Amino acid sequence: MRIELATIQDVPELQELQHKAFGPQCIELGWKDAPPMTESLEHAYEEFSQCTTLKILDDEGRIIGSIRGNVTDGSLYMGRLMVLPEYRQQGIGKQLFREIQRLLPHNRAWLCTCKQVPAPYEFYLREGFRPYKDEIVGPGQTWVYMEKKIRERL
């Protein structure tokens, strides 16, 4: 397995990964209209152009995980950390999560995650992120905003 920068040609495969990674949970929770499930290919291309996206490939060159990030005023936003279900619990998400932070210089990192899905929330806590805001976005849907401030090195 290897981590690489994704290219614009990867967008259709990344969108397929997104459906496979988030689809089962969205369906289970009754969120058929959740953004990861309803995003058009055109919008996916737009989003791609505004972020740095990393992908992790299996030995056959298939994308099995991804994350995207964008730094504004020293603040790194990370989103869409996703791994194919059959590759979870192998440290792939952790590798991507740490690599995007290493790659993009920042003094604060932030993200949002769904409060109703505990595994990602618990992972982010273990990685040193702390909640700072909740937002109800729909029936049974609450986003938790989390951040991690980076100390300046002396």
Please give the residue ranges for each predicted region.
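A short beta-loop-alpha structural element at the N-terminal edge
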Residues: 2-16
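Conserved GNAT-fold acetyl-CoA-binding loop/helix
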Residues: 16-44
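A short helix-loop-beta-strand connector motif used in the catalytic cores of GNAT acetyltransferases and
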Residues: 43-55, 77
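Conserved acetyl-CoA-binding loop-helix of GNAT-fold acetyltransferases
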Residues: 83, 89-102, 122, 126
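Conserved acetyl-CoA-binding loop of GNAT-fold acetyltransferases
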Residues: 125-134
